[in-house]
């Protein structure tokens, strides 16, 4: 770890300092006006954020989505005013009235930064540590994108080279997800990642001595990061010169991510509130805000005071952005001229289009043969990988079980890794046993853009990922989770590994599409539909979770209506259906066998396979009624999990064959038999439903 003296080339004027203090005043006033929020960190971090946005980062405030920009992630999302004040000062589109409406209905400045809501916000943060993992994912995506389009360029010479900056607080680094992601970043030697730690020693319960005593800098050194600690000024304020020097030094270290520890005083320079936990999540109070303004030379009677000189000075970021962009555009055009085929491929990817003929590469599976849907998914991924180069991903150390290896000869690993398949631009990601970080890194990869990401683990371990999965839905991100071993059918590993509540729980997340295909051909159609929904023509992206079997299941004729989420797999014979059997995944073949028994008894029975409730609900009412006729009240839903999903579909006369308790350690076939997932039990439930419907 280095602690460098300040020998900076930073140009820092009185107007720069006044702009920093203006950001502090705006943060204090915004929280005071609404009566709640987090003023302290936004006040103390103002010099660091200002230095990044005004002196360091390559960005164009006139076009926040410029592909050549550096990325900024505020992992400490509660300190959203740290970001909002800089977006306002730099001219990203926020105005003073937006800061005045902080945390109010319909404003552009919600309590925590929200991707897609506020221009210039790169990711939704708030749950602590998520942003750290998002930033790691962005840095990974930048490297993979470079490998797709400009792998031969010298370090720092490609138009695809840029930095990812992240500000994290004490709470972020206490969360387990940041440990997982930071370990991954060090292992991957992500030299394009710079993490600035706001080391203010304050948490909600007081000094961080209440919960933390480790040496965080040594921890990051152990992860393989380049670590620097910058000292504050004698008065306790952050030193922009020292921060600038540390960032510039970090940018020169290309074989490791960089960690910069900034010792700060929360709510500096508030005379009474600084260095207190009260300043973390509460308004300072009118008297303290006024006193703070006096300390900095502002009129205590004015609110939201921004001088013309300050805003004129900070809005020069627009001119700087245009100049930086002009330099980049020249390099980008030279790359295009030198690489016309790659440029054409880049244009396709940037437009969100898929290669011509990609659908033809998806295999069709032979009927009758028992194939595990996880195995089918693996074959489909490899087929897609041959024609969709931007598709990449991996597993949380379960690749052989999840069947997620898209290319066995190409692992995403840094130069110098001893494994023979190691390639800095490889396609197969080894996320390690870090499920939570994997999901959040996938979010970062999707946010970065220009690649298509998937990641796998057992369905039961989706619990480890849940917060990041929820955020992927909140942000409408096109990520795909490959969750295998999706029921008691996994067998002997027992109830710790057998998902029971998971399907219903995941379906409860708004905007997440859970897809549980019945067989290999439904799996193929599901992958095709997922990729189709990733294209820009489809509109807003959505995350998908594939729930796949460990065990083999019968393969049926492919039916394109599987892409609608629910369809008639087998129609009733001998008249209109008296009962409809609805099933998903490995239970579909149980419903099919039950239909055969019912038909043999003269009961016309329809089987509906419903791989995705969410896709089905997106169809028009006419289609849904054609699959589940309102006139047929006798219905049975069959799924090896809790039955919460199915009450609305079966109605008062319906029955649900479900699993309302944990599983057990035994062969999967034995468990299906013991827990009632048999043709006989489903047929019996159907007869009960028919009787109930006739009452």
PLM regions and their residue ranges:
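Intrinsically disordered, low-complexity segments enriched in small/flexible residues
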Residues: 170, 279, 365-366
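Short acidic, Gly/Ser-rich segments with clustered Asp/Glu that frequently serve as metal-coordination loops
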Residues: 171-177
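Terminal amphipathic helices with adjacent charged low-complexity linkers/tails
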Residues: 67-68, 261-355, 614
């Amino acid at each position: 770890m280095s602690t460098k003296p300040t020998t900076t080339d930073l140009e820092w004027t009185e107007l720069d300092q006044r702009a920093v203090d203006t950001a502090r005043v705006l943060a204090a006033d915004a929280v005071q006006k609404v009566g709640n929020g987090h003023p302290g960190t936004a006040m103390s971090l103002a010099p660091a954020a200002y230095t990044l946005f005004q002196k360091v980062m390559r960005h164009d405030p006139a076009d926040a989505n410029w592909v050549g920009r550096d990325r900024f992630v505020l992992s400490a999302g509660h300190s959203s005013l740290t970001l909002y004040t800089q977006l306002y000062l730099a001219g990203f589109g926020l105005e003073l009235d937006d800061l005045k409406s902080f945390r109010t209905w319909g404003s552009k400045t919600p309590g925590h930064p929200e991707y897609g809501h506020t221009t210039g916000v790169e990711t939704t943060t708030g749950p602590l540590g998520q942003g750290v993992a998002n930033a790691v994912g962005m840095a990974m995506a930048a490297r993979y994108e470079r490998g797709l389009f400009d792998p031969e360029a010298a370090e720092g010479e490609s138009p695809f080279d840029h930095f990812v900056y992240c500000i994290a607080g004490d709470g972020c680094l206490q969360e387990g997800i940041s440990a997982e992601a930071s370990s991954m970043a060090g292992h991957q030697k992500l030299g394009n990642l710079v993490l600035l730690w706001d080391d203010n020693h304050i948490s909600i319960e007081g000094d961080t001595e209440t919960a933390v005593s480790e040496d965080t800098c040594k921890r990051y050194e152990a992860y393989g990061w380049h670590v620097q600690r910058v000292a504050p000024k004698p008065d306790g304020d952050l030193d922009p010169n020292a921060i600038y020097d540390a960032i510039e030094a970090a940018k020169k270290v290309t074989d490791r991510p960089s960690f910069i520890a900034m010792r700060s005083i929360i709510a500096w320079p508030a005379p009474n509130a600084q260095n207190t936990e009260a300043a973390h999540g509460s308004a300072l109070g009118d008297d303290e805000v006024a006193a703070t303004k006096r300390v900095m030379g502002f009129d205590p009677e004015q609110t939201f005071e921004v001088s013309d000189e300050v805003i004129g000075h900070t809005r020069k970021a627009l001119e700087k952005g245009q100049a930086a962009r002009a330099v980049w555009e020249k390099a980008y055009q030279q790359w295009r001229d030198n690489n016309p085929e790659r440029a054409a491929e880049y244009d396709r990817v940037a437009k969100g289009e898929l290669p011509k003929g990609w659908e033809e590469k998806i295999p069709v599976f032979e009927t009758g043969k028992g194939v595990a849907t996880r195995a089918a998914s693996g074959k489909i991924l490899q087929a897609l990988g041959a024609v969709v180069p931007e598709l990449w991903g991996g597993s949380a150390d379960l690749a052989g079980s999840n069947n997620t290896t898209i290319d066995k000869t190409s692992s995403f690993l840094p130069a110098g890794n001893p494994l023979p398949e190691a390639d800095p631009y490889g396609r197969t990601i080894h996320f390690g046993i870090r499920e939570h970080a994997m999901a959040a890194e996938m979010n970062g990869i999707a946010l970065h853009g220009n690649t298509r990401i998937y990641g796998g683990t057992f369905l039961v371990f989706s619990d480890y990922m849940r917060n990041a999965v929820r955020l992927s839905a909140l942000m409408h991100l096109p990520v795909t989770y490959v969750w295998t071993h999706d029921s008691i059918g996994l067998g002997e590993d027992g109830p710790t590994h057998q998902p029971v509540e998971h399907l219903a729980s995941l379906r409860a997340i708004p905007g997440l599409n859970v897809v549980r295909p019945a067989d290999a051909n439904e799996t193929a159609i599901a992958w095709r539909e997922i990729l189709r929904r990733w294209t820009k023509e489809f509109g807003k992206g959505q995350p998908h979770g594939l729930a796949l079997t460990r065990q083999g299941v019968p393969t049926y004729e492919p039916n394109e209506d599987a892409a609608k989420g629910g369809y008639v797999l087998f129609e009733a014979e001998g008249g209109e259906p008296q009962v409809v059997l609805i099933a998903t995944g490995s239970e579909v073949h149980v419903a099919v066998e039950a239909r055969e028994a019912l038909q043999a008894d003269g009961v016309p029975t329809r089987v509906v396979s419903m791989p995705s409730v969410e896709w089905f609900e997106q169809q028009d009412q006419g289609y849904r009624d054609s699959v589940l006729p309102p006139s047929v009240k006798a219905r049975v839903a069959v799924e090896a999990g809790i039955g919460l999903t199915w009450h609305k579909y079966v109605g008062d006369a319906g029955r649900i064959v479900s699993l309302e308790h944990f599983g057990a350690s035994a062969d999967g076939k034995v468990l299906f038999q013991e827990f009632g997932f048999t043709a006989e039990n489903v047929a019996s439930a159907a007869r009960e439903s028919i009787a109930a419907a006739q009452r």
